[in-house]
Amino acid sequence: MSRLLHAEEWAEVKELGDHHRHPQPHHVPPLTPQPPATLQARDLPVYPAELSLLDSTDPRAWLTPTLQGLCTARAAQYLLHSPELGASEAAAPRDEADSQGELVRRSGCGGLSKSPGPVKVREQLCKLKGGVVVDELGCSRQRAPSSKQVNGVQKQRRLAANARERRRMHGLNHAFDQLRNVIPSFNNDKKLSKYETLQMAQIYINALSELLQTPNVGEQPPPPTASCKNDHHHLRTASSYEGGAGASAVAGAQPAPGGGPRPTPPGPCRTRFSGPASSGGYSVQLDALHFPAFEDRALTAMMAQKDLSPSLPGGILQPVQEDNSKTSPRSHRSDGEFSPHSHYSDSDEAS
């Protein structure tokens, strides 16, 4: 550790200087200031007094009173209050002062050294100022946590967006899996891609819609049964007799009470005669077993109107008169058409 110079040591240094300067009494050493009064008290170190003892070649020489114009107050405050320089930086000037005293004792020419240039002084000053600025920037970074908060908010938003996208993709994949299970895969072990799945679904939907629009595509209509053929044959025969009965009705025949349009026989067989059933008629299915006596019954009903239709030949009227007592009335039909109950007797109809 360095130590301060005593007054006795300063006296010795002064005597050595006077001895060397005796041939030139008019010459005054530039850097031999008198020790301040504060140095006499050994236990009271003062930084400005110590700085005045530094050599002009030392980088800290710009803090001497000769260079007080270059931010002396800031630099002195930095040296006095810096915690990092309390032990190391403060000890360096003392060591250098001791070495300077020894050099003065040996040679006595320490005052003739060259002073540092202004460029070097400015460089040292910039270094010190740069250190202060760096420290201030570090403090400002620590005091401004807003950037960290902003980064935290952005990170949370990014994580939330990633979670939403992950859920959306999971739902989309689940929907495609269900669609693959519905559409026909034709025993294909390979898993269809999303594009192929959509194409197959489109084709499948179009095929189903066409099938609904044309339900009987590729099916031949069933052939008509034998009963339907017999029905058409006998209905054509009845229509011919119906034309003759209509002519007689125009000549002056009055329709029997309860007459009405012919009932439409229900069933799988379709005919060209369609109309609502009368109140007195019965809607029954036509059967081929009823039609063998159809022509005789129709002829008998027509011949019963011999008085109303004199145009008919007389030879045909005799069998009609003989068989008239055995036949039942025409079930109140006036159009000469076959009635389903024409084969019943009067007793059956009355009951």
Curated annotation (Swiss-Prot):
Main location: nucleus
Domain of life: Eukaryota
Pfam families xref list: HLH (PF00010)
GO-annotated biological processes: auditory receptor cell fate determination; auditory receptor cell fate specification; axon guidance; brain development; cell differentiation; central nervous system neuron differentiation; cerebral cortex development; epithelial cell apoptotic process
UniProt region (Disordered), positions on chain: 16-39, 89-116, 244-278, 308-351
Stretches with biased composition (Low complexity): 247-256
Subunit structure: Efficient DNA binding requires dimerization with another bHLH protein.
Stated name of the protein: Transcription factor Atoh1
UniProt source species: Mus musculus
Gene this protein is translated from: Atoh1
